């Protein structure tokens, strides 16, 4: 059975991370009137919500595992460092750079055709990520053999 504490922690992590990303982006941009950014954050909210529902119904034990600590005892040390760097650069710093560029520099203004392409690729990536999580009940942030869950 899924531990409620870890389930709540998983949901909280997802949505607090999204809120932090939005705050970083809009603070760096210096403005809130950016329709494409709002579309992205709303779609990401919908993605987080629907993926949680799908995972909770199909692989509740995965929610329990992902709601716990990202750093398990058996996690590889090198992978812990990769996760820290990825979290900083991939989850937070990119929103600062994108917001700063859009609000102050506008170095690379992209047309609507790029928005459609980006949206399509974003949706494809969502489907692939959720599919991988459903197919692999051992899907965790770091590399480790989960002996406690009989992974071989």
For every predicted segment, state its role.
Residues 1-152:
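Membrane-anchoring alpha-helices and their flanking helix-loop junctions
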């Amino acid at each position: 059975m899924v531990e409620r504490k870890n389930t709540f922690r998983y949901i909280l992590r997802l949505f607090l991370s999204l809120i932090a990303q939005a705050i970083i982006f809009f603070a760096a941009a210096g403005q809130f009137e950016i329709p494409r950014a709002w579309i992205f954050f709303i779609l990401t909210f919908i993605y987080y919500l629907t993926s949680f529902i799908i995972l909770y119904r199909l692989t509740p034990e995965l929610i329990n595992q992902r709601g716990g600590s990202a750093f398990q005892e058996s996690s590889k040390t090198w992978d812990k460092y990769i996760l820290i760097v990825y979290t900083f650069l991939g989850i937070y710093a990119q929103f600062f750079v994108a917001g700063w560029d859009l609000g102050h520099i506008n170095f690379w203004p992209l047309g609507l055709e790029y928005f459609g392409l980006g949206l399509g690729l974003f949706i494809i990536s969502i489907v692939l990520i959720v599919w991988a999580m459903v197919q692999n009940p051992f899907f965790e942030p770091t590399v480790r053999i989960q002996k406690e869950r009989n992974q071989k």
